[in-house]
Amino acid sequence: MGQKVNPHGLRVGVIKDWDSRWYAEKDYADLLHEDFVIREYIENKMKDASVSKVEIERAANRVNISLHTAKPGMVIGKGGSEIESLRKHITKIADGKRVHINVVEVKNADAVAKLVAENIARQLEGRVSFRRAMKQSIQRSMRTGIKGIKTEVSGRLGGADIARSEKYSEGTVPLHTLRADIDYGTAEADTTYGKIGVKVWLYHGEVLPTKNNTAKNAE
């Protein structure tokens, strides 16, 4: 099961938190769709800003968005112009609710699966050999101190007539262990031969239960 399912979804509520945090009764579907549209808009508008995660929290008439990015300067823009434009557009999507955007800097892009996958995809678009792109990314990520990494590319690799998948890994990536902190990210490379899918799994080590959590469980 661990090999097939999205590692983040499998661990939500165990060691990972939800990316959308709010409660609704009647208009649950509308708010869920709103979240989806907001994320899609941010992903398209901030394509080159290395956005790794978008967290959304809602209160009565307010939407708080946390943007995790490796390039905060690009998200904020000159004098805050970019982030203000982003806020205005999201306000329209959110039916006039008050929108607050918080930019969180990602210190090390090589230790975030989504950004590693995007980096490999950009290299593939620049006609770099897929083996070279994967091996270089693996080396850079392992230098950050992670316990293991697994990468996979699928599609017409090197312009081949028949699509295939290739995997490279280093260290350990225990997908079945629920307490294992595994970061998972995907990206797509648009090449002249078609799309190439990129998947990356990073293993950061085990999340051990704290004393407080253990006491709560005992109660």
UniProtKB/Swiss-Prot annotation:
- Mind listing the GO molecular function terms for this protein? mRNA binding; rRNA binding; structural constituent of ribosome
Q: Which gene encodes it?
A: rpsC
Q: How does it assemble?
A: Part of the 30S ribosomal subunit. Forms a tight complex with proteins S10 and S14.
Q: Which Pfam families match?
A: KH_2, Ribosomal_S3_C
- What are the recorded Gene Ontology BP terms? translation
Species annotation: Exiguobacterium sp. (strain ATCC BAA-1283 / AT1b)
* Annotated KH type-2 domain residues: 38-107
Question: What is the role of this chain?
Answer: Binds the lower part of the 30S subunit head. Binds mRNA in the 70S ribosome, positioning it for translation.
Q: What is this protein called?
A: Small ribosomal subunit protein uS3
Q: Which PROSITE patterns match?
A: KH_TYPE_2, RIBOSOMAL_S3
Superkingdom assignment: Bacteria
Looking up PANTHER family in the UniProt record yields: 30S/40S RIBOSOMAL PROTEIN S3, SMALL RIBOSOMAL SUBUNIT PROTEIN US3C
Protein family according to the UniProt entry:
Belongs to the universal ribosomal protein uS3 family.
Gene3D superfamilies for the chain: 3.30.300.20, Ribosomal protein S3, C-terminal domain
Q: Which UniProt keywords apply?
A: Ribonucleoprotein, Ribosomal protein, RNA-binding, rRNA-binding
Q: Which GO terms describe its cellular component?
A: cytosolic small ribosomal subunit
Q: Which SMART domains match?
A: KH
Q: Does the keyword Ribosomal protein apply?
A: yes
